[in-house]
Amino acid sequence: MSKKYYAVKEGFDFNSNEQVKDLILESWEECIKYVKGVKGAKYKSFGTRVEAINFLKEKMENLNKVTGDYPKDCIHIYVDGSYNIDSEKYAFAFVAVKDDVIIHIENGASTDNSKKQLRQIAGELEAAARAVEYAFGIGETEVAIFHDYAGIYHHAAGTWERKDASSKEYFNFMQEFLNKKNMNIIFVKTDGHSGDIYNEFADSFAKQALHIPLSRAVDTYLQHNCIKVINKQIWDKIISVVKLNNLVNILIASEE
């Protein structure tokens, strides 16, 4: 039997009653002591010690927006995907936010139905990949990706099995930005349709790309709250998914 190495990124030592981090162990019997019954434990087995070390060095985190202490000063990008049953096409969208100001919006739809078996997941993965590429392109070295599909993180980290070409391509793409381009990527899980306005905007723009009727979540929020956008170009894009009576609460930051 080939030897395995067990990398424990986060676990717990019940004997010392302390959290443990960044351990490399050489047996499952040792590993299980630190991960069994531990909520949120992060660990993985590898065939070589080098792979285990690289796993521990990965500049990638998976947090929850409600409980996670994610950085507030880096660029935040909200991603989403959608799927049209009739056309069998998917769409992607992402909304980039810096210092509570929407600075960029991007969306689009597939040109064919070759990924219909993945439904909206194809759009989710494309949105995250494009978001990281956008952040890198404007000179950011750290980005927080807010998502409601868990695979956005797990397919990037390699903790889920990659069965289709899309997830394999996504994994390779993200690993290149992590390891060769030295991007620090923080993944933050949000609950879909929970009232998070930027997440709702991402959902609306993904649906817009497929001509799917929009939910009322954005308008409901804007009836009592304001948002800020960086310029008139983004303002114009925002109003394409907002009812006219709510425009007063969309502020252009440069005109304040």
For each predicted feature, which ranges?
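RNase H-like nuclease fold core
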Residues: 68-122, 126, 134, 247-255
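Short arginine-rich
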Residues: 36-47, 60-64, 134-141, 210-215
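A cross-kingdom feature marking charged/low-complexity
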Residues: 58-74, 233-242
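Acidic two-metal-ion nuclease catalytic site recognized across multiple nuclease folds
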Residues: 216-256
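RNase H catalytic domain
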Residues: 82-83, 88, 128-201, 205
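Short aromatic-glycine-(Arg/Gly/Cys) micro-motifs in beta-strand/loop hairpins
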Residues: 1-41, 55, 59-62
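Short, surface-exposed amphipathic charged segments that create phosphate/polyanion-binding patches used
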Residues: 57-61, 200-208
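Acidic, His- and aromatic-enriched active-site or binding-groove loops in soluble protein domains
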Residues: 170, 208-220
